[in-house]
Structures are given as C-alpha cells and as structure tokens.
C-alpha cells in the first residue's frame, strides 16, 4: 500500500484516525495549558507575596517540577491516582486495579509541569511593569481590583505573551508523552498504526508533519496576539 492510500480516507486508510488523534492532542494540550495557567497565576502570586512561607512554597514548586522528568510526573499522577481510586473502590467490594481517566490524568500532569514554567513567566511579567503607572493609579484613587484590571493585567499580559507562547509549544511536545498511559493522541495513534501495518516511517512522518502544522499555526496566533498587544504602545511612542 502506497503512502497516499495508507494516509487516505478510504476504507483501508488511516487518515480519519490520525485526524481524530490530532484533535485529541490539541484537546489534552489545551486542557493542560489552561490548568498550568491557573497554577502559574497562583505560583506567581505566591512568589511575589510578602509571606516568606508562600515564597518558599512557590520556589519549591518550580524547582521540583522543573527538576523531575516530565515522563516521571505522568507516571506518578497515573499510578498514584489509580492506586487511590482502587483503594476507595475496594471499600465498596471492588477488587483489582481501577485505572483513572487517562485524559484527565494527562491534562493534570501537563498542567502541573507547565504551571512551574508559567509561574516564572508571569512573575517576570509582573516585575517588568511600569511602577510609576501603578503608583499613579493608586494616587488617582483606584482600588486594588480596578488597578489590577486597568493597569496591571493589560501590561502584564503584554510582557507575558512571548513566554506563554513558548510554554504552549513546550506543552504540545509534552503531550506526546501521554501515550505511555494509553491515551490515543497523535503519538499513540502513530504507534498503533505502525504496529498494524509495519510501516512505521510513514506514520511517524505524518505525525511529525501534523505536530509541525499545529506548532506553526499556534505560533502565528501568538505572534498576531503579540503584535496586537503592542499597537497601543507603538502609537504612544
């Protein structure tokens, strides 16, 4: 079977399977990225707080998650959560191993890891803010919420966008590791297809092309967002 038939959308083609796996990759990557953004906001807030305990917790979180291999984090989440679920199920008479949702575990693992990187990105963005504008807002009588919404958030988002875009690209690549726990995303589908047809090069080449396509499109989206965020600044220069 030639490449066009193998990756086609006919009865013997794998085109639909690869597209479904691509959609799954994007879904788990976006979910993990969003979870990581939440962890990143919390971590950045803790690292910038006046509390020594919160600063230590944020530092420990980023140091640990950036030091542990991502694959090991995925295994810890999967087997740890599955063990807890199995123990709880045994209380109700169930026996044997009960696996957790691979999508949920994968998204959580990616989110916790990416959150460590997003913590640093968001912390740097806040530290880069124009302190004069913040003091001017306070002098004008702005409350904390209004000050955050009108001054801190717009500027911090502008400074954070390049770093957040880099974290998104990292998350896309990390999503391939979730194949080890059985989630049928792009890498897992390529493994299944290559094993079934004994044509691994065709499947991994297609997977690489699809990853590059996702990376290129998302890179353009972030580049456009960065350009739009700088418009007001450029007009003011």
Curated annotation (Swiss-Prot):
One of its GO terms (cellular component) is ATP-binding cassette (ABC) transporter complex. Induction: By octopine. Belongs to the binding-protein-dependent transport system permease family. HisMQ subfamily. Keywords: Cell inner membrane, Cell membrane, Membrane, Plasmid, Transmembrane, Transmembrane helix, Transport. This is Octopine transport system permease protein OccQ. Component of the octopine active transport system probably consisting of four subunits: Q, M, P and T. InterPro entries: AA_ABC_transptr_permease_3TM, ABC_transp_permease_HisMQ, MetI-like, MetI-like_sf. It comes from the Bacteria. CDD domains: TM_PBP2. It is a multi-pass membrane protein. Residues 22-222 form the ABC transmembrane type-1 domain. The gene is occQ. Its main location: membrane. GO terms for molecular function: transmembrane transporter activity. Gene3D superfamilies: MetI-like. It is found in: Cell inner membrane. The chain crosses the membrane at residues 26-46, 72-92, 96-116, 201-221.
């Amino acid at each position: 079977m030639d490449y066009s038939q193998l990756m086609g959308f006919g009865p013997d083609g794998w085109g639909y399977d690869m597209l479904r796996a691509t959609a799954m990759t994007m879904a788990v990557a976006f979910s993990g990225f969003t979870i990581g953004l939440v962890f990143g906001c919390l971590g950045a807030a803790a690292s910038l707080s006046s509390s020594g305990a919160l600063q230590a917790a944020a530092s420990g979180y980023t140091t640990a998650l950036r030091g542990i291999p991502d694959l090991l984090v995925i295994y810890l989440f999967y087997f740890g959560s599955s063990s807890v679920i199995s123990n709880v199920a045994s209380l109700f008479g169930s026996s044997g191993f009960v696996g957790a949702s691979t999508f949920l575990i994968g998204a959580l693992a990616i989110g916790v890891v990416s959150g460590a990187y997003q913590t640093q990105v968001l912390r740097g963005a806040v530290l880069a803010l124009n302190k004069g504008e913040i003091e001017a807002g306070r002098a004008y009588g702005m409350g904390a919420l209004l000050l955050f919404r009108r001054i801190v958030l717009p500027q911090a988002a502008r400074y954070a966008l390049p770093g957040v875009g880099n974290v998104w690209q990292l998350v896309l690549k990390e999503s391939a590791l979730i194949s080890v726990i059985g989630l049928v995303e792009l890498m897992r589908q390529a493994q299944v297809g290559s094993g079934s047809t004994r044509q691994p090069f065709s499947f991994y080449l297609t997977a690489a092309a699809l990853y590059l396509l996702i990376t290129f499109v998302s890179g353009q989206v972030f580049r456009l967002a960065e350009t739009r965020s700088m418009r007001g600044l450029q007009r003011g220069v």
